[in-house]
Regions:
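Bacterial Sec-dependent N-terminal signal peptides
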Residues: 1-21
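Active-site histidine-anchored catalytic micro-motif
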Residues: 20-67, 109-204, 209-210
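Conformational coupling and interaction surfaces
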Residues: 21-22, 39-51, 183-315
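Metal-dependent C-N hydrolase catalytic cores
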Residues: 24-26, 63-129, 287, 291, ...
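Short N-terminal amphipathic alpha-helices
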Residues: 53-54, 81-82, 267
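Conserved beta-strand termini and adjacent loop/short-helix elements that scaffold enzyme active sites
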Residues: 58, 84-88, 205-207, 274
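Short, well-ordered secondary-structure micro-motifs
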Residues: 94-96, 173-175, 215-217
Length: 315
């Protein structure tokens, strides 16, 4: 009887802990720039705070991106997390069809495979299943978001929040005072317009806060010395991407906005996407979005380093 009571208490504690975790989905273009890998690693290493419902891939060779995500999950012992491929758009131009160097890390990996469901359908299903409970991270071109809106125009409004690495509002690349057509916006301008006009609760981690987050050589060396499955994967992918360049962790900032809201300053404004891929602010209109305008960069880097070094993910 005492054993049954003890088991019951343990079960209730487990259920309570799960209930307190934030449900999340990540939509990403893993494999191009290296920042997607650091974003996924931050999310995976934060399973004490996140209940990860799944990862979806977007833009270009979504099958190769999904294969890369599957291997990363397998290496860290988290292969139960589903991976769904978004619509393959590798035929739109040469850039979209690029076989990125990071893909070689997972080439031929077949121990875990993506689910059959498309990325858009997976996200729709999860948002319908858990209305107002899910944070959807969007850290790539928003082609999947467009597909979702066209299939189910109201469903993005069921997300508790969408946090998107998207846009350039007051600041451009490398801190320039001149704004730029940010990559995730300009890759699919039609999709970007639909996304910002979707009526969803969207928080934008644009260049205003992401362009300052640099991962220098000393930081990378600390990861290398950690020697864990997750940090080894990051180091391998970083080397394939570039052995010398300093990464900007654009996408990891989007994850950080959910983990560490105290490090960010935001502003509610009305934004729209123009025909050239600029994200324009119109302060004469009622706000339709929330944009990041400030970040405590040093503290953010310190915190994510702690997460990477203290995790013990593995098989």
């Amino acid at each position: 009887m005492k054993k049954l009571l003890l088991l019951g208490i343990i079960f209730l504690v487990f259920i309570s802990a799960q209930a307190q975790k934030q449900k999340v989905i990540l939509d990403c273009d893993l494999g191009d720039d290296i920042d997607d890998a650091y974003a996924i690693a931050l999310m995976l290493a934060s399973t004490d705070k996140f209940e990860i419902l799944g990862i979806t891939t977007c833009y270009g060779r979504t099958n190769d991106r999904a294969e890369l995500a599957c291997k990363l999950l397998y290496e860290t012992g988290l292969e139960q997390i589903p991976v769904a491929m978004g619509r393959n758009t590798s035929n739109i131009d040469e850039r979209a069809n690029w076989y990125a160097e990071q893909y070689y890390w997972s080439k031929g990996f077949n121990k875990v495979k993506p689910i059959r469901q498309s990325g858009a359908d997976f996200i729709i299903e999860q948002l319908r299943k858990y209305p107002n409970e899910v944070i959807l991270f969007s850290v790539g071109p928003v082609t999947n978001m467009k597909d979702i809106i066209e299939k189910d125009p109201q469903v993005l409004k069921l997300a508790k929040k969408v946090i998107a690495m998207f846009g350039s509002f007051y600041v451009g690349y490398n801190g320039s005072p001149t704004i730029n057509p940010e990559w995730n916006v300009k890759v699919d301008i039609e999709a970007s317009k639909k996304f910002v006009n979707s009526g969803a609760n969207i928080v934008y981690a644009g260049l205003d806060i992401t362009t300052f987050v640099k991962w220098d050589k000393m930081m990378q060396e600390r990861l290398l010395y950690r020697q864990s499955p997750l940090t080894n994967a990051l180091c391998s992918l970083k080397t394939l991407w570039s052995n010398t360049a300093t990464p900007t962790l654009f996408d990891a900032v989007a994850i950080g906005m959910a983990l560490y809201p105290d490090l960010f300053k935001t502003e509610k404004v009305f934004i729209e996407v123009d025909d050239k891929g600029f994200t324009r602010i119109d302060k004469t209109k009622n706000p339709n979005s929330e944009i990041g305008v400030g970040i405590n960069t040093d503290e953010f880097l310190k915190r994510i380093m702690d997460v990477y070094l203290k995790q013990n993910l593995g098989r």
